[in-house]
């Protein structure tokens, strides 16, 4: 897939105010500081499309970007930022859950995982929740360029082993680096394949 057009449409905290229409939506979510904005900018080829912040957990909005005038890329708030406080964390959880459970246009959720870290309980529990609610999702491992030698392969294998404790069938997964544009083609082709399947129905 070639992205010829990517434009910001709207930010909000209320799923009912998301864009009308039937365009499929591909949402991106992950823990704070997982590299989500950088990944979105890399995928779209637009350096400043999604704002990157030096402060983890700053974004508390659902951001819609219209891609090729045919589908939406949705940037969801990051979860698990402890310094946000209990009230802030509850507010974020409500925004995320309302979008994921109520937004009929959401076609697939991409869960971003920092490839440098060992499996995190918060991510595993979140994916378990997705499974319990029948939400289609894929995993994107980020920051692959930060690991040298065979460390990346070791970390990914460890993560998949952990997932197999919960899942009979593993979700699709992609290995990416925003710095090196690694995984861009694979992720976009995956989105394109789903779009073609939807259009054929």
Curated annotation (Swiss-Prot):
Q: Where does Mg(2+) bind?
A: 37, 59
Write the record's keywords in alphabetical order, separated by commas. Answer: Cell cycle, Cell division, GTP-binding, Magnesium, Metal-binding, Nucleotide-binding, Septation
The UniProt entry's GO biological process terms, in alphabetical order, are:
division septum assembly
The record, for InterPro entries, names: G_ENGB_dom, GTP-bd, GTP-bd_ribosome_bio_YsxC, P-loop_NTPase
* Required cofactor(s): Mg(2+)
Against Gene3D superfamilies, the record matches this protein to: P-loop containing nucleotide triphosphate hydrolases
Family per UniProt?
Answer: Belongs to the TRAFAC class TrmE-Era-EngA-EngB-Septin-like GTPase superfamily. EngB GTPase family.
Q: Sorted alphabetically, which PANTHER family does this protein's record hold? A: ENGB-TYPE G DOMAIN-CONTAINING PROTEIN, MSS1/TRME-RELATED GTP-BINDING PROTEIN
- The name on file for this protein is Probable GTP-binding protein EngB
Q: Origin organism of this chain? A: Bacteroides fragilis (strain ATCC 25285 / DSM 2151 / CCUG 4856 / JCM 11019 / LMG 10263 / NCTC 9343 / Onslow / VPI 2553 / EN-2)
Q: Gene name, please? A: engB
